[in-house]
């Protein structure tokens, strides 16, 4: 008679690590020609309300619409970096809404600490050249960020 096999359990013994959660947050901005619009933690209402929880950028979706064509470039930053780590390249915004997705490259997706300075830039969008020149109407962008939040147990003290 063959020995009896025990059933294996997929459950781990002991405590499990706290899971991270994904949060989508949206903010609105106006781009102007030859100017940079910066987005910080305080720009996103949900991140601002999370207190000192650390977060990681998963992706940004930028949707822009403008009465006159406007070229722009979006840049993504890592914590503490003064130079961008990834960019969309030159994009064109016009009367038809266009969506561009910006994700960090592998190895460049670092955590922003919970006590991130209010002035630390996460995303910057440069308005480059408009077809109307100085008389260009406002150019609206909707920026939706997907962020990974650290577990609340790991909040900064």
UniProtKB/Swiss-Prot annotation:
- Is the keyword Nucleus in the record? no
Question: Gene3D superfamilies recorded for this chain?
Answer: Satellite virus coat domain
The protein's superkingdom reads: Viruses
Query: What SUPFAM superfamilies does UniProt report for this protein, alphabetically?
Result: Satellite viruses
Question: GO cellular component annotations, sorted alphabetically?
Answer: viral capsid
InterPro entries recorded: Satellite_virus_coat (IPR010392), Satellite_virus_coat_sf (IPR037164)
GO MF terms on file? structural molecule activity
**Cellular localisation:** Virion
Under the heading Pfam families, the entry gives:
Potex_coat
- What keywords sit in the KW lines? Capsid protein, Virion
Q: What is this protein called?
A: Coat protein
Q: Which organism is it from?
A: Satellite St. Augustine decline virus (SSADV)
